Amino acid sequence: MARKDTNKQYSLRKLKTGTASVAVAVAVLGAGFANQTEVKAAEKKVEAKVEVAENNVSSVARREKELYDQIADLTDKNGEYLERIGELEERQKNLEKLEHQSQVAADKHYQEQAKKHQEYKQEQEERQKNQEQLERKYQREVEKRYQEQLQKQQQLETEKQISEASRKSLSRDLEASREAKKKVEADLAALTAEHQKLKEEKQISDASRQGLSRDLEASREAKKKVEADLAALTAEHQKLKEEKQISDASRQGLSRDLEASREAKKKVEADLAEANSKLQALEKLNKELEEGKKLSEKEKAELQARLEAEAKALKEQLAKQAEELAKLKGNQTPNAKVAPQANRSRSAMTQQKRTLPSTGETANPFFTAAAATVMVSAGMLALKRKEEN
């Protein structure tokens, strides 16, 4: 900055010197022509030249000032460049110093890594020894578990045979029940009854209608119980499926257990479907009895005969079934403790006794003698009311 001020002062001094020279020249010219009046025109020319000279001096002074300004700027830039060069040299020194430090650190790191590698190698050798010991121990454990699973598999085979025998027995009972139902339906179409009995059972019919509603409600509750048992069996089926993945060695035995669980689930679903169909049949028959007042006298007599015959046949057939089921339960009691879990759940569900609120019976809650009696009584009551009206 001081250098720039000095250059500006130098330029002003030169400008003043040039201006003074021009002034002297003008004075000389003016003195030469002062006494010559005839040369006024020439004096004007000189003045014009002086003016031109002054303008030229001003231009030169401005150009000189611009040049000095440029020189000052270049000098400043040169100083900046010198400073940057100094900074770069300092950075170069720092980089060389850092490079040396990095080399020292790299050598130290290499030595540390070599030491760690040696330690790691020793540790791997020790780990290899431990691994061999663990493998021998694992082999012994696998052999032991295999023997245990083999024993469990044999036990499951025995339980499966017992369960299969129980399932076949229940299937025979179910088939016998279905045959009995078909026989009742065939006998119902052929039997006849008396119309006068409707008047004698009027009071029974009044109470029986309410009993029918309670029996229907009990049937619905039984349906819910079957659905709950189905859900429990489904959960148990899922549990058996998850336990199947515990050991590859016991895969075959667990697969058989899973298949047995699926069969039990299908059986429960079939029982539920049958219960639903019977419940719908009861509701349909009840609805037909409600609409019985629209029948003719002949149709009323036929319907009354059918209902009474059905009630009688059902009572006899279901009494026989109750005796057979009691005998079957007595024969199956010693094997109850060894049955597998899936069949135990199904047996408990099928053997569970239920008491109807109207009669206190413990027979099949979906199609009982009491329910048939109620339906017959309700039909008779509807016919009698039609006659009285």
Curated annotation (Swiss-Prot):
Signal peptide: 1-41
Positions of the pro-segment in this chain: 360-389
Kinase keyword on record: no
Region annotation Disordered: where it falls in the sequence: 93-182, 194-224, 236-271, 326-362
D repeat start and end residues: 305-310, 311-316, 319-324, 326-331
Motif LPXTG sorting signal: where in chain: 356-360
Membrane topology field: Peptidoglycan-anchor
Keywords, alphabetical: Cell wall, Coiled coil, Peptidoglycan-anchor, Phagocytosis, Repeat, Secreted, Signal, Virulence
One annotated GO biological process: phagocytosis
Region (2 X repeats, type A): 89-135
One annotated Gene Ontology cellular component of this protein: extracellular region
Compositional bias annotation for Basic and acidic residues: 93-147, 157-182, 194-204, 212-224, 236-246, 254-270
Coiled coil among keywords: yes
Ranges occupied by A- repeats: 89-99, 125-135
Sites of Pentaglycyl murein peptidoglycan amidated threonine modification: T359
Top-level division of the source organism's lineage: Bacteria
Biased composition (Polar residues): 342-362
Classification via Gene3D superfamilies: 6.10.250.460
UniProt record similarity statement: Belongs to the M protein family.
Name under which the protein is recorded: M protein, serotype 49
Taxonomic source organism: Streptococcus pyogenes serotype M49
